[in-house]
Structures are given as C-alpha cells and as structure tokens.
Amino acid sequence: MVRLREIPRTATFAWSPGADSPLIATGTRAGAVDVDFSNETCLELWDLGLSREDVSGELQPAAKIDTDSGFNDIAWTESDDNKRGVIAGALENGSLDLWDADKLLNGSSDSVISRSTKHSGAIKALQFNPKHSNLLATGGAKGELYISDLNNVANPYRLGTAARADDIECLDWNKKVAHILVTGSNAGFVTVWDVKSKKESLTLNNVGRKAVSAVAWDPEKPTRLVTATPLESDPMICVWDLRNSHAPERTLRGHESGVLSLSWCTQDPDLLLSSGKDNRTLCWNPQTGYAYGEFPVVTNWTFQTRWNPHNPNFFATASFDGRISIQTIQNTSTDTAKAIADQNQALDGEDFFAKAQSQPQVSSFSLPKAPKWLERPCGATFGFGGRVVSVGLTEKGSRTSTIKITPFEVDEAVGKSTETFENALKEGDLRSICETRATNAATEEEKADWKVIEALISENPRKSLVDYLGFQDKADEAADSLAKLGLGKDEDVNGEPAKESRGPGAKKHKRLQSMFDANPEGDSFLSDLAASKGAKTNNPFQIFNGSESEAEKGITRALLVGDFEKALDVALKEDRMSDAFMIAICGGQKCIEKAQEHYFSKQTDSPNYVRLLASIVGKNLWDVVHNADLSNWKEVMAALCTFAEEKEFADLCEALGDRLEEQVRSSDEKSARKDASFCFLAGSKLEKVVAIWIEELAENEQKAIETGANDTTFSIHVHALQSLIEKVTIFRQVSKFQDTEHTKDSDWKLGMLYDKYIEYADVVATHGRLQVAQKYLDLVPEKHPEAEIARNRIKLAMRQAAPQRTQTTAPATRATRTPMGRPMPQPSAYQPQSTFAPAAPAAPNTYAPPTAAPNPYAPAAPAAAAPAPPQPVNPLLPHRRMAVFLLLLRANNQSPATVTTYTTATNLPAWNDLPEGFMKPPTSRRATPATAAAPITSPFPNQSPPIGHGPPPPGAPPTQRTPSVPPPPKGTAPPPRMSSPLAGAPPMASMAPPPAAAPAPAPPANPYATLPQSPPMASSMAPPASIPRGPSPYNAPPTAPPPSNRYAPSPAAQAASPQLQTRAPVPPPPQAAASPYAPQPMAQPPAANPYAPSTPPMVAPPMQQGPPPPQAGGSRPSTANSQRKAAPPPPKYPPGDRSHIPAEAMPVFEILSADMQRVKSRAPSSFKAQVDDAERRLNILFDHLNNEDLLKPNTIADMAELARAIQARDYDTARAIHVDIMTNRMDECGQWMVGVKRLISMSRATP
C-alpha cells in the first residue's frame, strides 16, 4: 500500500466527480478538536497533484471558504449548469449549503449557490442520486429525511410523516434502481424507502436493534446491502439480502471496535472498505466474507473511507488524528519503514525523543486476484510451438473465462514442405528428392548442387562425377580416333578383314580391347599356343655373334644371370629407353619406377601430357592440383576422380576448391563459386560448401525480394533457409558425414551451420513441428549457448504429463487406524529390544508428525498452571500389580471410546457464518488476557481415562471435562492419524509420576510463528506427556547433527543420569482460551512415526546408579574414523541446472517450484530464513532429478502425484504420499524430504 498524499485536516471529505485530475473537498468535522484547539470551520478544496513526483512539503488548499458550522457529511456531484459540479454540505446547525466548485477554485465571492434550513436538527448524512445528479437525499436528527431537487432546493419533500426519536446516521441510494433509498439510524432501524411512492418499503430485522453507523448497496445486485454497527462490544458488518430480511446473509467480523464507515467499490463488487474505532481500515470481499487484509493503522479513529469514483485504484481515509490519507490498493515494499526503524534503533537517550521518526504501523497485503477494472475481458498471445492462446468471457457480464489453445502457422507452406521432406527422408528415397529439388531449382547454382549430390548417391560416385563433368563422351571420341588410324581393324591369317559386331553395346568397347573382340578365333589362340610349346622352330640364332657392342654384351650377360637391374642400368646409360622399359617390366616394380624416373627426367621440353603422366605414375597429383591452370579445373577433377587414392581424394578436392574460391574473391567471378562448390561436394567438405551455400542464400533471398514476389520477406527467407537445410541434410547422409567437433565448447568449423540449425529449429517449432526442431538442435554441440536455450524451450514445450499412479490399497504404514479410544501401543520396527526402559528423550522428535493441526485462528494461549508438588518414587511396586495394569491398559485400548464433548461441526454456506480466512488476533495495545482452560488428563481429549487402582496421589491435578470445541472452518476434515505408542497415557496412581516440568509453550496464534522452545528437562527425568500444539510450517530444521545411525534415538535420549531423582505428577498441558473461530481439533490422535525412538512400556524404570551397558549394535558416539566416508561421485550436471530433468519428472519441478514461489511471496518477512531453507532443500531434490540419480522411477511417479495433490490443495493425500516414501524408501530420501514436508505445511498455511 502506497500512501500518496496526506491532507492535514480532521474533516469529512468528498472526491471530485469526472475524469479530471482528482480533487478532494473537505469540511471541518463537527465536534473535532484541532491540534491548536481552533474552533474555525471551513470548506476547502485540495488539488492532490498525483502527477507530480515531488511530494515534499505539506499540501496546501487550492480554495477555502469559511462556514458558520462544522460538517457531518459532504457530497460532490456533476452538474450541467456548473462546470466543476456542485458541492453539498451537511452542517451541524441543520443547514444544507450548496457551493459552485468552479467558483470556489476561481476565488469568486459568490460561490454559495443556496442554503436550506428545513431540518430542525443536525444533518447527519447526505448523498446525491447516482442516476439523477439533481436529486439529493439528506437525513438527520429526529428521523428527518428530505429529498431535494437542485432545481428547486427551497422546496424539498419529506419521506415519512411521523416524528421519530431516533436520528438517521447514514443513507445510500440504490445503484441499480434509482428511486430506492436505504437509511440507518442510531436506534437500529434499517429502512428501505421507495422515493417514487414516497413511502417506506421494508425494515430489516436488525436483531437487538443495534445502532447502525453505515449502509451501502451492492453496486450490481439491487437487493443486497451491507450495514455496520458502531458498538465497541460487538463490532460487525452484516450482509443482507432483501429477499430474506429476517436475518443477515453473512456477518463480517474483523474489527476490534465499532465500525464507522463503509464504502463499496462501484467498479468491482468484490471490494468493500470498512473503517472504525480500532483505528483500522480493512478490505473485504463481501461476496464470500473473506478479508483481504488491513491497510496501515493510524493512531485514532478512522471515521470515513471512500473509493475514488472514477479511478478506484485510489481511496481516501479520514481519521481523528488530523489526517486524510490518500492511498493505493497496490502493495509495495516496506524498505522505507524498515530504514526508519533501523535509524530509530541507533538512537539512544535524549536523541531518541529529539530525532526519532514516527511511521504508521504497516500491515501490507496483496489482493489474491486483480480488481475487476484491471481484468481483461479478452486477450490473445502467441505461444511457443505454433499455438495461440486466447481468453474470453464465457458470457457477457460474467467473470468466468474460457481459455482456448489453437494451432497457428505463419506460413502454411513451410509446415507442409517440412513434413514432405521429413517423410521422404524416412522413406529413404534420396535420389527422388535430389531429382525433384534439381527440377524445381530457382538458380543454376542450386540445380548444379543437387545434380552433384545425386551423382554422389550412385554406386561408383567417382565415375558418376566424371560422367557429370562430360568426360565420358570425350573418351568415346578418343576411341573413335584410334579406329580411324587403323588401330581398330584386324585381319585374319588369310588377310581377310574380320567381321565387326555392331550390337547395341558395341560402342562401349572402342578401346584397345575392342580390337580383339571382333576376332572370332581369339578364344582359341591361347589354347593353340599352349599346344605348340614343345614344338621346334626352324629359326636358329646366336647369343653372341661377335658384332655386339660392349653395352649389348653387358646387357646380355646380366640377363643371362637374371640381373635385370644391372641390365637396366646399362640400357639407361646407353639411352636405349625402349629396351630399358622392356627390361624393367621383367625386373619388377623397382626397375619400372627407375625407368620411369629416368624417362621423365629426360623429357624437359616434352608435351603437357607427359607431366600429367608423371604425376599419375608418381602418384603425386598435388602438382596437378596446385599448378594446373584453373580453366582446366574439370580436367584436373577428372584426373582426381580417376587416379587419386582414397585417403588423399578429399584433401585434393578441397585444395582445388580453395583455389577456385580464391579466384572468386580476387576477381569477383561468381561462376567460379559453383565450380568450387562442386569440388567441396566431391571431397565431402561440408564446412567449406556450407559457407558458399550460406552466401548464396543471402543473395538469392535479396533477389527474390527485389523481383517483387508476392511472398512476404519472412516467407522468402524461410523458404531459402529451408532449401539450405535440405541440401545439408541430404549431403550429410550421402557423404556419411561425422561431426568431430560436437563435444567442443567453442571455435567450431561449422559455427555458421549451427546458427542456421538453431534458426531453422525456431522456425519449424513456431509452426508446431517440435520433433523436427529437436532433431536439428541435436546436431548442434551441447555447449552451444543459444542451442541450450532453444533445447530447453523445446523440451518444456514437448513435456508430457507423468503417467497417473495406479491407486492401490494403501499400505498399513500409510493409513493405520485404531479403535476409537486410546491408541494401541505400536512397537517401532527399528527399536532394538532391551530389558532396560530408558527415559523418553526430552528433545523433540524432528520426524514425528505434529499432534494437532496448526490453528491460524486461535488466540494466544495463557501461561500454564504451576506444576503440582513432587511425589516420591515408590520403589516397592509389586510386579504382579504392574502386569495387571498392563493387561487392563491393553484391554482398555481395545474397548470403544467413551462419549466426548466435541461440538458437532456444521457447514452452513451462507447464513450467519464467519468470514473465511480472516480473524486477526488482538494487537498488543488492546489485547486482554485470555482465561485459562481447564486442564485435561490426556493430551487427546477423546481418549478414555486408563483404569487405575485407588485414589489419585495427593497433589495430582483433578480430572475435568474437556471444553467444547467450535465447528471447524469450511473444508474436508483430514484423515485420522496414528499416535506414538503410549505417548499420551496419564500416570497411574500407583506409579511414580514424572518430575515437575516447566509449562510447555502454547500453540501459536500465527500459522507462520516459530514455536517457543520448552525449558530444558533434567538429564535423567522423563518428559511430560505429549502436548498437542500447532507447529509452524516455517520452523527451522534442528541444528544438532543427526547420529550416524539413522535409526538411533536423538542425542538427547543418549544422555544418562547418574541417579534417578524424585518425580512429580505431570502438570496439565496448557490450553488456549476457547475461540469461537478456531477449527475443530482432529478426532483421531496423530499417526505413529516409524522413525522416532519408540517410547518405552509404561513401567517404572528400575532404580540404579548408572545407565546399563549399551547393547550390541546399538547407537554409539561416532568416532573420527567411523565418520570418514568415501567422497561422493561428482554430479553429472552442475547444481542449479534444470535442462536435463526428464519429462516424467518435469511436473515435480514445475509444480513444487511454482508453489514454493507462491509461499515465498506471501510468507511473513520474519520467516525468510525458514522459507529459504525449505527452498534450498527443494533445489537438492531438483538437482537429483536433473542428474537422474538417487530417485527411482516409481518414487518419481509418487512425487509427481504428490505435486499434483499440492496443486489441487489436497494436502492430506500429499502428506500420506510423503510418509509412504519416507517409510518404505529411506535409501532414496535425503535433505530434500524435509523441504517437501515443509512445503506441504507452508502451502496449507498460506492463503
């Protein structure tokens, strides 16, 4: 709440009508005494200047005129004859004065319009008709009620003729029916008048005829109104429906003293202001009786409050402390008030009184829903994933809305083409995709790209690339040339030409082997030759004939001994190249390479094909790639496809493409870019070809825009982007591309492609194709910052509700019930058996559920009664008697409960019920001590008393009847709980009672309050019986570290006393004063806690000088060695990361975090530490969910059900699931379970 302005007057006031800058008219309140004891009375007009930021200094009146009497009421209405309207004043001397507001502001001396003195006494109230602004109703002493017409003020007419002894204190015109008026008197009469017929319609049956100080009509329902009583003994506001005038429909109780003023907001009937003698101004929902909260408290009575008629964001409140406060209904932080409080704390001594600043008490609140004038009747917004969310009223005039989610696509063609392409990919027909895209290509470059990709799909990609370059036809032409030279003909032995075969495939064999295909005797040649191997020929020769040169002799000798390498050296030395090649063929690969090297070294001025041949033979195609003229790039590419080794092919293609790309940059020759793209495609260099494609994308997009196509710029860009993504996708599949940089966190070679993937994913996601978007985002490195954000959005948009948990029969640990009466003792599953019964620990059990539900409505409890004097221990208790007691106790547990004095809860929805959700405990300045309730013998009022033997010991508290408990607030009752074993059994007469204990703390009045700690018990004394008390959902966790054994009792239970001492009976637990607004306590005792140390059987512990030795396996103080544990493995993801939470666990994170934020925003600031601790523990749970560790799938499903129960405010189900998880799955629990438990309690206590 922001206090915008303050008018330093004790005066009644009225807001100016109309939409102009708001003004306020004030009239000195009759009977009020100013600070300076001045008796001056006047009418003043104030310009609030709400548009001004500078609010320093005190407001000064814009106009002022003295009057001869004080004001009881004032009104301001619009008028056709007066520019700024007419102001009417109800004066204490019985005069009705009218002023022209415009003349007052201008300082004119004739601002008084008229004066009427028809009233014989003081005029207490007046109001202009909201439908007819010329009609003015005035009411005052002796029941006088007049209706005046501004056109004839001197002749008003009176409603009701009989003289009355009571005074009309308030009146109000009906907001829907113009001729209906209601009045309230100090005698308790609430009368409805029909002004048209000038008679009384009906009188409400105001029980007890309590005085009425204010009345107000419902602005929308003409039959509903509210009344207020100024009595300090019974302050209340009654909501009436004229259709049942015998009793109020609802009573609103929140004020501590009489109510003096009401103001019902005309723009929102769910907002009602009330102010009164308790110095407070409250805001209500009169439709439900719920009190939203309280505005800052002042130091004296607040006698008038009014909404601004035009802008209800503002309202004003007048009080007898000499101020009229103009405030907003919006809540803001109280940093200023805190700063002043801190400053005052630093002052001491006389400086405090000299320098301390006063600040009104602040009690801020926020409206749970927006006021009606701020509500949007309709609205729409675009949602991620191709959705439009629209909101509209179900019917005109209602406040219920319908939410619709409809699919939306910016460009339907994008969605259709995306689906078509993805379906084609699933079918795997890549060739048809390439053919279709090549046919529909808009540019030659795009068509060439698709043709090359199509060539790469074939079984022999290199041959297909050569064919695409056009070298297949050139090879055929070469074969034809050989045929023309005669190399293609052959003759048989008879000299006749061979017959050629000219079949369909004959053209394919026009190389050297084709010369033998036409010889019909070719197949028998080898067989004939083999048959003639042993035949002698008539052709003798000499190895040496004497005419040989030395070189020839050396070659011959080397050949005879098989030394081909020496023979080759001689031939090369003599430059006999033909002989050298023949010898090299016989000598093997080494000789061949030597001959080739010698040959190429001699060919310095040889033709170009020789250099090409040298590169091919030497397997060094880099010379061709780096040095060949780029005009012959196709020939170079053909050579690479034909002769390059597989491991070098990609790099050779990249080098050739780089040369072509460099040529594009140096000469700006765009045609070479297509050639470079071919090389990069052939070499499967995606990072290089993508850069070209992205450059082409921008150029093609610009051309399409310049050509004036009908498509929008968005559609043009998306289609170009889609074409790029399709080419990249097909190329990756064809080339089997593997991204080796997917794990890097920066400096990616494909960085530009990743950006396009992210952009395309966003486009297809906005068209509703979330699966496709996720597919392409998965191709982007995980550590890409923009991709991570996009993935999270896609993941959230694709999340699915967790499967519903099958409802099965609840295990016994979750819903164990006992017969009505005293609960059965339940042995702990983790308590070791011992013949020694230790004293119950004095420390509270942090895992035990509370013994009673917190009561946010109960007043503070009184101090407990003084404990009874101690009683000596009887060490001679017979064992037989104790056994009889245990048998009787067990039998009593199984017997039905005795009849208790609980009041039956009622649930009346409308009449005479109390306001829901609001009952403020009295403040300290008006608090009165509550009367202590009678003590009870058991902490559970409906528990049967145990059967004892003999009269109670002296000094034992007498048994008294449990006081009746009023009905609970609306809502279903929580399920019954189990009780800890024998936690509440009273001491037997023959047993040694526990020692006297200090009074236990009372249940807190504030649902967020931290419970005061109990005084410490003696180390060896048993604690008193359990006391039902309401725990605060914001209590901090126990600070003491838990024992190493999670089933061991708390540290307080481990302390042993050297000697037992005398004990006294248990003092009765303190009970809060019976509150008529408190909810009814639970009918069943609280559930047993399987993790708490079990309470020992109810037997007197034997006398001994020290504790017994610890049992084997029991809890021992942990040593340094036992506390050393292996360091846990590092988490998979850093704390706070929520992007990897699986879909089935997402509801847990979303619902619990949202509810935690709701609680955090509404919890009292004094409990910030407790709320932050609960939030920290919930974040531990979310980290486990994000890392997918600790929690198993069934536990995650249970947690999802628990979250949905919290969302539905079904806290009993949520707590039952929580207990079940803690009971049966302790290995999955940790610190986060305490946070979940706290959230359940906080959420239940937070409105």
Curated annotation (Swiss-Prot):
Region ranges (Disordered): 487-509, 798-854, 908-1141
Major localization class: membrane
Biased composition (Low complexity): 798-823, 837-850, 921-939, 979-991, 1045-1064
One Gene Ontology biological process: COPII-coated vesicle cargo loading
Compartments, as annotated in UniProt: Cytoplasmic vesicle, COPII-coated vesicle membrane; Endoplasmic reticulum membrane
Membrane topology reported for the UniProt record: Peripheral membrane protein
The protein's assembly and partners: The COPII coat is composed of at least 5 proteins: the sec23/24 complex, the sec13/31 complex, and the protein sar1. sec13 and sec31 make a 2:2 tetramer that forms the edge element of the COPII outer coat. The tetramer self-assembles in multiple copies to form the complete polyhedral cage. Interacts (via WD 8) with sec13.
Record-linked PANTHER family: SEC31-RELATED PROTEIN, SECRETORY 31, ISOFORM D
Bias (Basic and acidic residues): 487-502
Top-level taxon: Eukaryota
Annotated InterPro entries: SEC31-like, SRA1/Sec31, WD40/YVTN_repeat-like_dom_sf, WD40_repeat_dom_sf, WD40_rpt
Renumbered ranges of WD repeats: 5-47, 66-109, 118-158, 163-203, 207-250, 254-294, 297-337, 381-406
Pfam families assigned to the protein according to its UniProt record, in alphabetical order: SRA1, WD40
Full protein name: Protein transport protein sec31
Keywords: Cytoplasmic vesicle, Endoplasmic reticulum, ER-Golgi transport, Membrane, Protein transport, Repeat, Transport, WD repeat
Organism: Aspergillus terreus (strain NIH 2624 / FGSC A1156)
Known function: Component of the coat protein complex II (COPII) which promotes the formation of transport vesicles from the endoplasmic reticulum (ER). The coat has two main functions, the physical deformation of the endoplasmic reticulum membrane into vesicles and the selection of cargo molecules.
GO molecular-function term, one example from the UniProt record: structural molecule activity
